[in-house]
Amino acid sequence: MAGSLGNLVVAGGGESSDSEEDYWDIGYMDRPPQTTKGSLATEERDETFKKALTSGDVSLVEELLNSGMSVESSFQFGWTPLMCAVNIANVELVRILLDRGANASFDKDQYTILMAACAAHASESQILKTVELLLSRNANPNVACRKCMTPVMYAAREGHAQVVALLVAHGAEINAQDENGYTALTWAARHGHKSVVLKLLELGANKTIQTKDGKTAGEIAKRNKHPELFTLLSLTVNPLQGKLQHLTKEEAICRLLTTDGDAGKEHKFSSYTAFGDLEVFLHGLGLEHMTELLKERDITLRQLLTMRKEDFTENGITNIRDQQKILDAVKELQVEEIKFGELTEVINLEISSDEFLNFLLKLNKQCGHLTTAVQNIINQLPVNSHKIVLEWGSSQRFTSVCENLVCNVEDLGEEVCKLKDLIQKLQNDQKNDPCRVLPMETYSTWNSRFLKRATFTVCGFGFLLFIFKLTFRKS
């Protein structure tokens, strides 16, 4: 094949989950040329045809086809002209060949035209147009090669998020596995393609599927040193799970190809918008339809978590099921305001020691809960900023609130110290007060002992007197 066709392309069925470097070199082969004039002329025509294809010479390709060159000519390694055209994602040539009758479902050793297009050496926009053209000619997106890899896996491996979305919209099985158990999500995670991972999660990819060696996509990302993807894939709740799963094919394609201006002609997809904490919470509960409503009313996650039923109605959340979902989630998260009104009242000077002790114990328990909550947040926050997957607001707001918290904690500490000193002073004054009335239990203990002894003595004398009289009468 021509020198420009010497690009490395994935071999038909020669892919491996352990090494993505298995390629074919479809360049020249060192072998002596044919000597017969007929075969020499044919080889020259084939060589000219291949050069025209790889250089994108549309007029020459059409001229050769008009002169009798077959649209299904077999080049080196059994490749057809269409295979060569999609390998460089030349949309115009692909369209010409298809219009001339080229087979969009052709495969060489189970390596299909569509697979070659997904692994092409070109820009994603060109690959996207090529793939869409092939799909319009009934190319099957679920055919697998000898290693059980499908076109969506090739696209995910190469990092083409838009191509992945288009294939899935046309019915590609998103959770299919190759011979080593890799899915499209696993391939994207392995190569660190964040945009593809996000798109696959949005399309409903299952991140819990394991490879044959028992690894999930997140663990594969971690093993290949992609900590950001590992963090994203390790989230308990998938904020993007299956957003487009329940759409029809036409609706999904429309959603995926919706852009501004002339972007629709260029088949560009809207970029992924990072999720904030409110969006993650709502998506986790299946309440993503409330996102716009809450944003319009400037309701933050913190405000949402502290709302009551009457607050929901006032803010337009009228669906009882939606209200209950939020309330159940709040209860599960144990997010609640400290209601000091429920603590024991201590303003009464006649309060008993048991009630006062109960108040202090409750206050101490609340402080312990707050400390544990802060410790949990510290343990969950990543050390490095590049590991943060979800969008955050200005860090200045967070640090400002933390500074206020520190001041409040210091004030609380000072007040508790004052309370402790006051209690200690009261105890010391009571001990040193000469007019102090002894506790009732002290007197009761001494009196009870005296009464017991007196009673025992009287009973003893009475018993002896009775015995003495009885003996005297008998005698």
Swiss-Prot record:
Subcellular location: Cytoplasm
Record-level GO cellular component terms: pi-body
InterPro entries: Ankyrin_rpt, Ankyrin_rpt-contain_sf, Asz1_SAM, SAM, SAM/pointed_sf
Main subcellular localisation: cytoplasm
Domain named SAM: residues: 273-336
Region ranges (Disordered): 1-24
Residues carrying Phosphoserine: 16-17, 19
ANK repeats: 44-73, 77-106, 109-146, 147-176, 180-209, 213-242
Keywords carried by this UniProt record: ANK repeat, Cytoplasm, Developmental protein, Differentiation, Meiosis, Phosphoprotein, Repeat, RNA-mediated gene silencing, Spermatogenesis
A Pfam cross-reference name: Ank_2
Protein's GO biological process: cell differentiation; male meiotic nuclear division; regulatory ncRNA-mediated gene silencing; spermatogenesis; transposable element silencing
Cited PANTHER family: ANKYRIN REPEAT, SAM AND BASIC LEUCINE ZIPPER DOMAIN-CONTAINING PROTEIN 1 (PTHR24157:SF3)
Subunit details: Interacts with DDX4, PIWIL1, RANBP9 and TDRD1.
Known role: Plays a central role during spermatogenesis by repressing transposable elements and preventing their mobilization, which is essential for the germline integrity. Acts via the piRNA metabolic process, which mediates the repression of transposable elements during meiosis by forming complexes composed of piRNAs and Piwi proteins and governs the methylation and subsequent repression of transposons. Its association with pi-bodies suggests a participation in the primary piRNAs metabolic process.
Protein name: Ankyrin repeat, SAM and basic leucine zipper domain-containing protein 1
UniProt source species: Notamacropus eugenii (Tammar wallaby)
